[in-house]
Amino acid sequence: MTQTLSQLENSGAFIERHIGPDAAQQQEMLNTVGAESLNALIGQIVPKDIQLATPPQVGEAATEYAALAELKAIAGRNKRFTSYIGMGYTAVQLPPVILRNMLENPGWYTAYTPYQPEVSQGRLEALLNFQQVTLDLTGLDMASASLLDEATAAAEAMAMAKRISKLKNANRFFVASDVHPQTLDVVRTRAETFGFDVIVDDAEKVLDHQDVFGVLLQQVGTTGEVHDYSALISELKSRKVIVSVAADFMALVLLTAPGKQGADIVFGSAQRFGVPMGYGGPHAAFFAAKDEFKRSMPGRIIGVSKDAAGNTALRMAMQTREQHIRREKANSNICTSQVLLANIASLYAVYHGPVGLKRIANRIHRLTDILAAGLQQKGLKLRHAHYFDTLCVEVADKAAVLARAEVAEINLRSDIHNAVGITLDETTTRENVLQLFSVLLGDDHGLNIDTLDKDVAHDSRSIQESMLRDDAILTHPVFNRYHSETEMMRYMHSLERKDLALNQAMIPLGSCTMKLNAAAEMIPITWPEFAELHPFCPAEQAEGYHQMINQLSDWLVKLTGYDAVCMQPNSGAQGEYAGLLAIRHYHESRNDGHRDICLIPASAHGTNPASAQMAGMQVVVVACDKNGNIDLADLRAKAEQAGDNLSCIMVTYPSTHGVYEETIREVCEIVHQFGGQVYLDGANMNAQVGITSPGFIGADVSHLNLHKTFCIPHGGGGPGMGPIGVKSHLAPFVPGHSVVQIEGMLTRQGAVSAAPFGSASILPISWMYIRMMGAEGLKQASQVAILNANYIASRLKDAYPVLYTGRDGRVAHECILDIRPLKEETGISELDIAKRLIDYGFHAPTMSFPVAGTLMVEPTESESKMELDRFINAMLAIRAEIDRVKAGEWPLEDNPLVNAPHTQNELVAEWNHGYSREVAVFPAGVANKYWPTVKRLDDVYGDRNLFCSCVPMSEYQ
């Protein structure tokens, strides 16, 4: 044999699993595009002055099995103490049927945000169920389909309160002193850029303060007290103050809905509906408001509409509120939310139903009552008489109690003066309560659970009678039908079948990087060593997490060319906000706080201007030239005009037009010349890794979409992670945290997310990807992503003009197909092509971004030549169909394109079209058929007849 043992061990085996085209297929595609090799192609496309001489040294590739073993050893350094810390995070029991059929199912986790509703009806239905849960529990009229976390939701509530307040001269926001500290932290961060004054005081003192536009109360305080705020809310409403209430999903099963008490906005975390703590996330936040305020709400809202056949169909409603349309005037910069986690919570409610949820909530409360009764019998004092699941226990020798807790591998909340906090949850057992008695009282306490249970069962006054819920919840049939595992499994499968995800076809969305989310990368997220840690546990119990995070941070530093990385932002938009705050605070530290102008190219993603506005900056748009590049003359003029007020520029590279701009370093130099900073949006990092880097180019800060470039799945619209990389001068200004000191970060800035490391439990996905690819594999992934895009552009350019190209007519990792000439000639639009692609078994490319009337295609490196050819052939077949319309063979008002997509119901109904059923549903080359369950959505009907809760079951049948 001629192969060495090292070659036979094949440590780079995963590279060939991740990258779609093999070496022979790559050569075929290189021949098509007219390049000798990958290196030659990159040399033609990427400006030479920004090409790295060698790839960043992040180590050699490891096999899937070796990487898993290495990460398992790291995870083993975490200590899984039983957590009673609470503070918005509790242990859960995720039903195995949901774990296996959703969280571990690529049919759910590889889907994209449901901008194309015809291929998204399953997860849209699950999200509508989530909204119904929120409406029932909060007592309000309108709910969103999730926000990033509870603290972010609080900040959004404050911003919304200001938007809807009639007290236009008021500029103060009141926060009750017993909200969770991380919530207050994030609220203060947001308030600072908005110029709001935050007042923190006891809730009963709110009326003593003047010029208050909004109030934030917490129904169950951070130390456990259940508040009846009905009278206070009534008084605040009489003064036209907007009232927001933070609430707990599980507590709301038993407690009066804040909406019934008059609250305008109610929000909180849905984490305890089946989502593991995961050292802080990801978790979905819920958010609800009165109907009159619906157009001021942040985040995605799912609405009921109709399709072209008049059948009920679901869609994202009121999108004109959002960043991708309204840009800096949007209600929020939110793009990624937490769809996968919201759907877990939604299905948790479906599986347990109202009876099951009440049983769980009552069991938690009963055990808390038993714990309270036993402690009080033995002379310990509780701070609060009214509680749901949390006790604040005064202890004489706190150090001794905490020492016994550590020996018992128990975490209590320890930051309360002369007291400890104890939060119970659905995993708590009677044995756990006995162990808590021993920790707080000593082993000879002599207490008996059954005896205490009899006492409290007949005399529990721990929840005020006025605060006990007296209305039914979750009465819709969907919450009262699927309680056996068989029924639940089939329901989830029926939803999954309605959607198109990466397990069925490529999703060629430009600017979205829908690459492989490998099974080996996903496995660690459900390991209990990662899933079960509380984000505020002692640092010595999370040594495995810290090692993994530090190693990942070090790799990202090398890959980006920056000096430090902050892992806190839990979405790309959140990363933008955090990066801009770092720039803002850097300027302030130099007495340049007046620098508030942010230059943004006209082609920018909508989150850029929305994030700049959130960071307290003024947006000034920079023109692009006829080739789609930043107009340097206009940039220089705008920078000069801004002068000493220039804060920064936000630029994407390669550009959103799909080209490597030759002048990117000159762009950086111009901005630096006028005292500004360069924010390089990391959305297109998949075309940089191993080839160039933001730091090498000359940028100062970037966010990284780990859910794009580094393989965290999109989850149907979240979770995501958006850590920021910064140069050393910005490192002191990245987000900090009020509860946990972030190791290695000297920052004193406020937090942007509830948890110190954001959605920490999905970071192992990116760790695994980098570890298995190694330096050379990562570079090759970028090269093949660029090759695949150029192959598509080369094959399609005669049928659909490629709008922008760089040197030698090349594109970067994505290309924009210009549909406008075809529309002018034939009347067929980019929308018609997008919907017709569904009949061919594909998700549409990105429509009308960054240029109206176009389709932006990004194939990623994970798609094989066979799949690329299938897409190309579909696009060419569609072009032939357009030509038949142009030739008059099919009328413009009745052809397979304008009627697309076609459903099975339509196929078996009376056929009145001038083309055959076969042409409609089995067009040329379609073998792996995907069947949409609805026809094209009627967007106008949906927004004019807004309905955002569950419809009768008959509508689904």
Curated annotation (Swiss-Prot):
Transmembrane portions of the chain: none
Molecular-function annotations in GO: glycine binding; glycine dehydrogenase (decarboxylating) activity; pyridoxal phosphate binding
Coiled coil ranges: none
Record GO cellular component, one term: glycine cleavage complex
InterPro entries from the UniProt entry: GcvP, GDC-P_C, GDC-P_N, GDC_P, PyrdxlP-dep_Trfase, PyrdxlP-dep_Trfase_major, PyrdxlP-dep_Trfase_small
Catalytic reactions on record: N(6)-[(R)-lipoyl]-L-lysyl-[glycine-cleavage complex H protein] + glycine + H(+) = N(6)-[(R)-S(8)-aminomethyldihydrolipoyl]-L-lysyl-[glycine-cleavage complex H protein] + CO2
Record-listed N6-(pyridoxal phosphate)lysine modification sites: K708
CDD domains given in the database record: GDC-P
Biological process according to GO: glycine decarboxylation via glycine cleavage system
Cofactor: pyridoxal 5'-phosphate
EC number, as in UniProt: 1.4.4.2
Domain of life the protein comes from: Bacteria
UniProt keyword annotation of Oxidoreductase present: yes
Entry keyword set: Oxidoreductase, Pyridoxal phosphate
NCBIfam families, sorted: gcvP, PRK04366.1
Assigned protein family: Belongs to the GcvP family.
HAMAP family noted in UniProt: GcvP
Chain's role: The glycine cleavage system catalyzes the degradation of glycine. The P protein binds the alpha-amino group of glycine through its pyridoxal phosphate cofactor; CO(2) is released and the remaining methylamine moiety is then transferred to the lipoamide cofactor of the H protein.
Subunit structure and binding partners: The glycine cleavage system is composed of four proteins: P, T, L and H.
Name of protein: Glycine dehydrogenase (decarboxylating)
Annotated source species: Citrobacter koseri (strain ATCC BAA-895 / CDC 4225-83 / SGSC4696)
